[in-house]
Amino acid sequence: MLPGVYTAVKKDGTVYYRASITCKNKHISLGSYALESLANQAYTEAEHFLRDAFVPLEYALAHRSALSFDKTVTLINFRDNGVYIKTPIYLRKNYFEYYLTSTLVLKFDIDDLFYYSSHRIQKRGGHLFVSDYGMQYSILSRYGIKNHGVPGKDFLFVNEDPTDYRYSNIKIINPYAGVTRLTENGKTVYQAKIHINGYFSLGIYEQDYLAAIAYNKACDLAKGMGIAKEFPVNYIDFLSASEYADLYSDLILPEKYAAYLSSFLHR
């Protein structure tokens, strides 16, 4: 058997090959392969990357063949920083980098290390998310940003680097669903609107939380009219239950909204 390789058997009796290496008294699994030669190649690459401290991460990622992308990042970080992390993380001073690809590297505060060392980031349709207990959560939710938040509309990257997710670089513009911040005559105002079959404007408000309450009320009316759609709910943390109820009761939605809802019942 070639160095770093041992055999294993699947439930159906198929033989496959596992590669592993020991470094700094830690036994590291390198993956499973259909061919012994590939498993040995993974071992050879891992040995080279771990032994030669002058091999930079970018070079290792560009020249690996059998070793997986994630495992390469893990090994180089272990070599340089002495910490074994299963996800593709490389530690820097006071922050860390999460490698999605060789060209897409995200920066996070060190406070998030524990979370992302046990949660893999995935990208789909331009959105970054993690899976937790069978559910998918946008990484933006950790900043209090609503799902599918849009850069420039709902939040800003302060240094204009869209890969820098350190807390100091995230500025929330619009924390509420159904609310858009606008500037009219040099003054900041907030438009509430609901999406059912296209957008319907619910009015302009001087405070974002009032627009958020208007949106909540519009959602409640829509559901009360039998419109079967899941609407996100806004929570205004600084209002007591009675304060929220008073504002909710006093807030009047546009008269046309009731007619708009009725139009869906006659289709």
Predicted regions and their residues:
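Boundary-flanking segments of nucleic-acid-binding domains in nuclear regulatory proteins
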Residues: 1-267
